[in-house]
Every structure is written in structure tokens, then in C-alpha cells.
């Protein structure tokens, strides 16, 4: 039995040819042969090996079209099968035009030199991590640079704490929370120092603007 879903090729939509039935004397054997043939026919998806190769890899379709054109122009019957062309592909001729595939070497493995070229293409300076790159001036004296960075970090931390404490004092004083201020001598001294700096800056600005 054949159905409309598996009688035609999935690539070229042609009818899949069936093999002729053999005449046997025994009717049971004929029925068994018909059942096996129908099951094999239902498993077929392609009408020929060319369509099977086209469906397996798009590159094979280009190879087959190239072979058909060559057979029409030269009318030669001794062409190599397309399967041998697909086996002889290497990394160097994979992206070349189809005309150069006919002269590909008969090797199914990629040479070691070509593997090194492919690995070198994957390495790019933009893809390398930038965290480990150090200035050559810093490499000349790394201990001094580390000490400077630590000292600078502590100085910035002290300045930020001092500014934060003075900012809290000013904000609470302007909002009328003088009674809730902490009675710490350090905070009071910082508050007085910040007021003196502001007053000096204002006097300097006033002198420059009036002159």
C-alpha cells in the first residue's frame, strides 16, 4: 500500500520509483513480499541519492549543480560521484566557489597547519581580558605604586567620613535638631573646622569680587 504522503520525494516532489514485483508461485510469499516492499516504500523519502545529498547538506546541492553543468558542457560520462567531493572538503576550500572544488585534494582530514590558522583567527586583542594589563611605569617599581594606592585610599576614606559627618551636622542643625546631635568632641571639632573653612572662603570671595 502506498499513501500520498510518502510516494513523492521531499526535495524535488517527484514520484518515488518502485521496484517491479517478482512473480512467485506461493500466494503467501507474494503477500509477504508486498508487505515488506510497502514498508520499505513508506520509509523512503527521496527518489534518488542526489536528492538525499541535497537534503543532507546545502553545499552538496551546489556540488551537484556544478556537476550537472559540467556534464552538459563536456558530455563526459566519467565524472566522479558527488559524494567523493563532499568527503574531500577541507577547511581551506570550504568557503571557496564551487569551481575550485573539483581540484580539491583527496584528503578527508584537516592538516595541522590549517588548524593553527583557524585557532589564530579566533584570538583577537579585543577579546583578551584587560584587567591584567599593567602600565610599564608601574611594573618598574610595583611596591611603591602599591603603597601609594593604599595611602590614597585611606586619605580618600578619611575625607569622605569627615565630609559626611560635617554634612550630617549641618543638615540636623538647619532642621532644628540641635538637641539630638551626638555629644562627641571629634564631631564638634569637625563642625567648628568646617565652619571656619566656609567663613575663610567667603571672605576670600568677597575680597576678590570687591576689588
Swiss-Prot record:
Induction: Expression is induced by the AFT2 iron homeostasis transcription factor, as well as by 8-methoxypsoralen and UVA radiation. This is Extender of the chronological lifespan protein 1. Present with 589 molecules/cell in log phase SD medium. Belongs to the ecl1 family. Involved in chronological cell aging.
Amino acid at each position: 500500500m502506498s499513501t500520498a504522503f510518502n510516494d513523492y520525494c521531499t526535495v524535488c516532489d517527484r514520484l518515488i520509483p518502485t521496484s517491479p514485483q517478482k512473480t512467485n508461485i506461493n500466494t503467501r510469499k507474494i503477500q509477504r513480499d508486498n508487505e515488506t516492499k510497502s514498508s520499505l516504500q513508506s520509509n523512503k523519502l527521496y527518489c534518488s541519492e542526489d536528492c538525499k545529498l541535497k537534503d543532507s547538506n546545502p553545499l552538496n546541492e551546489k556540488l551537484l549543480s556544478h556537476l550537472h553543468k559540467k556534464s552538459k558542457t563536456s558530455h563526459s560520462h566519467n565524472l566522479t560521484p558527488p559524494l567523493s567531493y563532499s568527503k574531500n572538503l577541507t577547511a581551506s576550500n570550504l568557503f571557496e566557489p564551487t569551481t575550485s572544488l573539483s581540484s580539491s585534494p583527496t584528503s578527508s582530514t584537516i592538516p595541522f597547519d590549517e588548524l593553527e590558522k583557524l585557532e589564530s583567527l579566533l584570538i583577537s586583542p579585543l577579546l583578551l581580558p584587560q584587567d591584567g594589563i599593567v602600565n610599564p611605569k608601574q611594573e618598574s617599581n610595583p611596591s611603591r605604586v602599591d603603597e601609594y594606592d593604599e595611602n590614597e585610599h585611606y586619605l580618600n576614606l578619611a575625607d569622605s567620613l569627615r565630609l559626611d559627618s560635617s554634612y550630617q551636622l549641618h543638615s540636623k542643625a538647619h532642621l532644628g535638631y540641635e538637641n539630638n546631635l551626638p555629644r562627641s568632641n571629634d564631631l564638634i571639632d569637625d563642625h567648628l573646622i568646617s565652619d571656619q573653612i566656609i567663613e575663610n572662603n567667603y571672605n576670600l570671595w568677597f575680597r576678590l569680587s570687591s576689588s
